């Protein structure tokens, strides 16, 4: 066999390099280097071709910056960059030199270029640099050059003085060829040696030198496995190799989609699946995974339907119960996870998820890049315990909006479950979870979705989420998921598969997204909800969580955005009545109710009232934002505090469909503004903590006296007073809006805050249990300082009254009839004549009168049966939470002593089961136990500390 050396191709010019040892997929001609085999201590010139890869920076005028770091032996994954240079979105980053024609270069010595500000400068000598990692950007960071599959770009470094080899052409993004075609193979070695090329095991070319070229021919369809071998010769010489695979595509007869097949994984039995991908306008697709070394293989080429829109593959003989990672390779260059995956592996973010949060997480596989989907035929089914749950009447919903990250310090579903007793005692009968499907990163509100059917692993396992829902149902609490179907972010394969890199937006031919959003409030990529593909996606999402996780409904984020009516530049017009949007939501609601009767359709709509009336009267529940009105009132400015819009009757609706709230995740916390901006005079100072907390009692008394579904935001019942815009460093800035906020379970030990909790609890119980609070006959007079609500019902009449002013107010309260009425909170009675009574109310005082005597709630600051969920500590005793504790728990007590203290965990007979040592944080002695000691069975235990401190702890 004759070989020839392509000196012209392998001269002194910079060449593309294949990434070896970190990620087997090559970055191809996106990056080239001189020398061809760079080392960490020698000068290397790197050339970036902006027209290659994702091509996002092609034609973008300079300056172009490198965002770069290194992958070392200490990196935990291919995306674990070390010693990153520069700050994103600034000019404090390495500037590339323009060479023209979309080419940019930079030169440096890697060992000293990174970590340059250290003393001594450079990457520590003990740390091995395996590769250089890059993405490239414009100044603002709004346009980013990456690999074709959206992953980072890598350039390997090599050990000096050793033999290395690399296949330079074909590159990793050039793995598909046509039968009968030719391709010029180019390989190189770091020193003169014996080079040989094998194709499917047979040697087809040899040479002695540092490069080898050969014209490959592909006479027929099939796999062509290429191996480049470099043999230094001599005794003890080690042969080194580089490999790649090409697939010659033959003609493919159209195959109909198997009946009943939907996008994603279709489980046929415990060992057989059908994978289906909807990918119109694509030419071919392969399934990749460990079963084919993440390389295209003719055996795993997907069938295509006659309309060239669907690709599918049946896989048999799989191991039941085994998790199998997989991806799709589309058009030979787009490597994506299954957009309909129910579980993914993320090389950038999974490494930050503690094993206690997600035990036994499947490791990210070697041999590929980007997000990977996971299937599991024959997966064990979750054993549901509470199968007879009856959903509460929507008119009586007391919904608690909760963000897992900011509700429990562990950020885990399991510890939310530990706290359900707290919510049950509060009177909650519906838990609304902020988005729990996969979103970008691990630390987020969740409104940046990437995979709509996969549960985000940052909060726990899929079964942890199911157990939380199951436990809620066991306590009479419905569960609603916040789902984000207005948009998806860039990690979504639905966006990546049809992407306009030049304009950094969805392509015009995307079957899912609008290239340009239709309204000004859009974030991410705007779904086209009139597209059949998007409608199928929405249907799948709705069905998946209702059926697989048994949720009770959805809060649809930004539901007003489900429209193709273009209102860009005219936000006011966006809220106008939109008949197409109404029809879409009716279709969604009908579909949900057909799948799961009486499931909740909750819309964050905030459109004009005429449209909301139609949707509400159809049976949907619509968010009613009364934050401004209630906060004006609690701050002591009653003139601007009419909250009549919390009433469906005030809106002219026929059904009680307004889910009114004073606080939500998206609004400023009432107590923060009370303390910062509350009214002050000689009588009242709302900026005083106890005064502000006392005024907060007005909120549940009035909000929960209005018939219809209601919502409160987490810890509002305790007077949470950190701003929505609080930053981790304690400052307040709008850029920190979605950052993590302090988790303040210690509020429950403050008597004034616990009193507020009990007022909320009492009103919540009335709202969900007393028929009068769901009456259709009620009246609001809430415009002035003294506000009133009247409920008329055959079972009982109710009058709520309160002084929202900061001055003493005299007023006349109107009653539905004459006779004796009873103050619910005090037990006092009043006799009503002429349907009125005269009152003089101090600032912030509230009254709730009922025509039937009810047992007054126990609001005393001593023990209350509603507190049994937690072992309430006496002064100086230990605080233990959560309690009961399924798994981990935290113990603490106030202390000025900075020295570590010893604690013991004992059983009720006094036998010591474990010993712990505390830390001091400047205010408290504390210790966190991530798990119970081995062998500890469910029961009651005692935590014993110094100076006789103790607390009871329950393991359920």
At which residue positions do the language-model features occur?
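Solvent-exposed segments in extracellular or luminal domains encompassing
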Residues: 210-223, 838
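Substrate-binding/active-site clefts of carbohydrate-active enzymes
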Residues: 28, 341, 345-352, 379-580, ...
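Active-site-proximal helices and loops of the catalytic beta/alpha 8
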Residues: 253-254, 437, 445-448, 473-475, ...
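Basic K/R-rich, polyanion-interacting modules in nucleoproteins and related proteins
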Residues: 246-285, 337-396
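C-terminal outer-membrane/trafficking sorting elements
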Residues: 867-881, 885-956
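C-terminal beta-strand-rich structural cap/linker in extracellular carbohydrate-active enzymes
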Residues: 285, 833-862
């Amino acid at each position: 066999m004759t070989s020839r050396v392509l000196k012209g191709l392998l001269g002194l010019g910079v060449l593309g390099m294949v990434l070896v040892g970190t990620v087997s997929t090559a970055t191809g001609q996106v990056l080239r280097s001189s020398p061809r085999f760079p080392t960490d201590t020698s000068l290397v010139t790197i050339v970036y071709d902006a027209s290659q890869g994702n091509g996002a920076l092609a034609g973008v005028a300079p300056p172009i910056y490198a965002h770069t770091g290194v992958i070392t032996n200490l990196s935990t994954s291919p995306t674990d960059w070390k010693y990153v240079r520069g700050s994103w979105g600034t000019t404090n980053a390495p500037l590339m030199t323009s060479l023209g024609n979309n080419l940019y270069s930079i030169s440096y010595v890697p060992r000293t270029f990174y970590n340059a500000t250290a003393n001594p400068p450079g990457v520590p000598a003990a740390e091995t640099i395996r590769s250089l990692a890059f993405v490239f950007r414009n100044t603002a960071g709004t346009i980013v050059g990456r690999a074709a599959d959206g992953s980072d770009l890598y350039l390997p470094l090599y050990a000096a003085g050793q033999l290395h080899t690399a296949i330079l052409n074909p590159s990793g993004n050039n793995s598909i060829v046509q039968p009968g075609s030719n391709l010029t193979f180019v390989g190189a070695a770091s020193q003169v040696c014996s080079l040989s090329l094998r194709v499917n095991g047979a040697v087809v070319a040899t040479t002695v030198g540092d490069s080898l070229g050969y014209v490959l021919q592909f006479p027929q369809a099939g796999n062509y496995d290429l191996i480049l071998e470099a043999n230094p010769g001599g005794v003890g010489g080690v042969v080194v190799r580089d490999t790649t695979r090409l697939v010659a595509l033959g003609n493919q007869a159209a195959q109909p989609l198997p009946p009943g097949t939907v996008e994603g994984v279709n489980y046929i039995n415990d060992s057989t699946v059908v994978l289906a991908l909807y990918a119109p306008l694509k030419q071919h697709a392969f399934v990749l995974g460990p079963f084919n070394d993440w390389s295209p293989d003719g055996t795993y080429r997907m069938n295509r339907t006659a309309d060239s829109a669907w690709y599918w593959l049946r896989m048999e003989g799989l191991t039941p119960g085994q998790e199998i990672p997989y991806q799709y390779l589309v058009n030979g260059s787009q490597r994506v996870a299954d957009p309909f995956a129910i579980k993914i592996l993320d090389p950038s973010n999974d490494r930050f998820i503690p094993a206690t949060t997600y035990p036994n997480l499947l490791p990210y596989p070697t041999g590929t890049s980007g997000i990977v989907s996971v299937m599991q035929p024959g997966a064990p089914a979750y054993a549901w315990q509470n199968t007879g749950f009856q959903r509460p009447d929507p008119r009586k919903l007391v919904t608690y909006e909760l963000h897992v990250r900011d509700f429990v310090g562990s950020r885990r579903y399991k510890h939310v479950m530990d706290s359900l007793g707290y919510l049950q005692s509060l009177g909650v009968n519906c838990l609304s979870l902020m988005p729990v499907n996969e979103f970008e990163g691990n630390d987020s509100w969740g409104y940046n979705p990437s995979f709509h059917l996969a549960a985000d692993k940052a909060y726990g396992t899929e079964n942890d989420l199911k157990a939380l829902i199951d436990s809620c149902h066991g306590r009479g609490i419905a569960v609603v998921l916040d789902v984000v179907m207005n948009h998806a972010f860039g990690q979504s394969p639905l966006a990546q598969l049809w992407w306009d890199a030049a304009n950094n937006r969805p392509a015009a031919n995307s079957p899912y997204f609008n290239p340009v959003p239709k309204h000004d409030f859009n974030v991410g990529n705007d779904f086209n909800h009139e597209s059949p593909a998007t409608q199928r996606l929405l249907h799948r999402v709705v069905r998946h969580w209702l059926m697989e996780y048994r949720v009770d409904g959805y809060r649809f984020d930004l539901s007003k955005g489900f429209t193709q009516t273009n209102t860009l530049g005219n936000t006011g017009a966006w809220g106008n009545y939109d008949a197409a949007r109404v029809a879409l939501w009716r279709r969604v609601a009908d579909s949900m109710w057909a799948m799961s009767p009486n499931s909740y359709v909750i819309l964050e709509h905030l459109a004009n009232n005429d449209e909301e009336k139609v949707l509400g009267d159809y049976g949907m529940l619509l968010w009613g934002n009364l934050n401004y009105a209630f906060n004006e009132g609690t701050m002591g400015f009653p003139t601007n505090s009419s909250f009549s819009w919390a009433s469906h009757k005030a809106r002219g609706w026929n059904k009680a469909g307004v889910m009114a709230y004073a606080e939500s995740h998206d609004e400023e916390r009432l107590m923060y503004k009370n303390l910062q901006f509350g009214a002050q005079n000689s009588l009242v100072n709302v900026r005083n903590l106890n005064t502000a907390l006392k005024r907060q009692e007005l909120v549940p008394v009035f909000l929960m006296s209005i018939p219809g579904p209601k919502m409160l935001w987490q810890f509002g019942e305790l007077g949470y007073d950190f701003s929505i815009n609080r930053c981790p460093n304690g400052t307040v800035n709008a850029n920190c809006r979605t950052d993590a906020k302090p988790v303040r379970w210690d509020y429950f030990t403050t008597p004034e805050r616990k009193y507020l909790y009990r007022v909320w609890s009492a009103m919540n119980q009335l709202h969900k249990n007393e028929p009068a609070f769901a009456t259709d006959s009620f009246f609001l007079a809430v415009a002035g300082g003294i506000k009133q609500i009247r409920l008329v019902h055959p079972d009982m009449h109710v009058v709520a009254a309160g002084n929202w002013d900061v001055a003493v107010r005299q007023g006349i309260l109107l009653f539905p009839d004459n006779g004796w009425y009873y103050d619910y909170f005090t037990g006092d009675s009043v006799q009503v004549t002429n349907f009125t009574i005269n009152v003089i109310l101090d600032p912030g005082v509230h009254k709730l009168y009922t025509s039937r005597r009810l047992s007054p709630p126990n609001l005393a600051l001593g023990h209350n049966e509603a507190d049994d969920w937690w072992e309430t500590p006496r002064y100086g005793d230990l605080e233990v939470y959560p309690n009961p504790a399924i798994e981990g728990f935290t113990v603490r007590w106030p202390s000025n002593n900075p020295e570590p203290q010893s604690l013991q965990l004992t059983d009720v007979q006094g036998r010591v089961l474990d010993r712990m040592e505390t830390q001091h944080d400047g205010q408290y002695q504390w210790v966190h136990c991530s798990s119970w000691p081995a062998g500890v069975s469910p029961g009651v235990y005692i935590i014993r500390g110094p100076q006789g401190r103790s607390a009871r702890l329950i393991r359920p």
